[in-house]
Structure formats: C-alpha cells, structure tokens
C-alpha cells in the first residue's frame, strides 16, 4: 500500500459539495495508484491544507463507467476526455479536518519534500503527522 498527496482545486470544482453528497470523488488516473492506497487530499487556495483522508476504492475505471460530475464543475469550458482515459475513485475514510496545522509549511516540517505542483507520494514521517489529525 502506498500513500499519496493529491490536490483539489476549489476554483475549478465544488469538491466539498461533491464529497458531502457522494462520499467519494473520481480523478483522471495519471499516477500508478492501486486499490487500497491511501490518499490525502490537499485543498488548494483559499484553504491550502490537507482536509480529507481517503482510500483508493477502485482504479482503472473506464470512461463509460465514470460518474458524471459535470454539475459540480466551475470551469467555463467542460472537460474533454477520450475513450482510452481511465479514472480512479477515492472514498472518504475519515471525517473532513479543517486545521491549519495541515498546511504546506507544516507538511514540509514533517518530512514532505515536494512542491504542490502535482500529486506526490507521501513518506512515513509525513503520513504519521497527517494521520494524527484524523480520528
């Protein structure tokens, strides 16, 4: 099992509403995530912190089976996908945490060694720190 930090942009998608309504979210699968991997969801500005702990419930979901989440999109142009695209489903496994101790600066202080420009693996030190906030 691997642990990952994925980003969610609230200026492009109503992530909090979607997770509240469905208990999961689907992403275009670009990383080698596998079922059972842990996902920490980092919410970008204005929050700038980890707010969700999730598990990969399903990977390699074909486009035809992916959920239509377009009503939650805030983008002016709809996303376009091709038939070969696959998606991954992250299911919540803990309640949302709204704590500024999970900001990027604090993650760096606890072993995270990356920028927030893309989704990244999480080492044990960082995972233990993040996990301490989730019950």
Stretches with model-predicted labels:
Residues 11-12, 27-30:
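Short, positively charged
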């Amino acid at each position: 099992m691997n642990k990952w930090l994925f980003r969610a942009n609230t200026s492009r998608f109503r992530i909090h509403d979607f997770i509240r309504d469905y208990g999961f979210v689907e992403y275009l699968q670009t990383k080698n995530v596998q079922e059972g991997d842990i996902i920490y969801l980092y919410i970008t500005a204005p929050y700038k912190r980890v707010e969700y702990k999730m598990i990969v419930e399903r990977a390699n979901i074909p486009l035809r089976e992916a959920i239509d989440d377009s009503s939650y999109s805030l983008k002016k142009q709809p996303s376009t996908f091709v038939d070969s695209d696959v998606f991954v489903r992250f299911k919540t496994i803990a309640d949302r945490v709204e704590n500024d101790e999970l900001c990027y600066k604090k993650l760096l202080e606890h072993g995270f060694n990356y920028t927030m420009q893309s989704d990244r693996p999480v080492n044990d030190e960082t995972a233990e720190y993040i996990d301490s906030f989730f019950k």
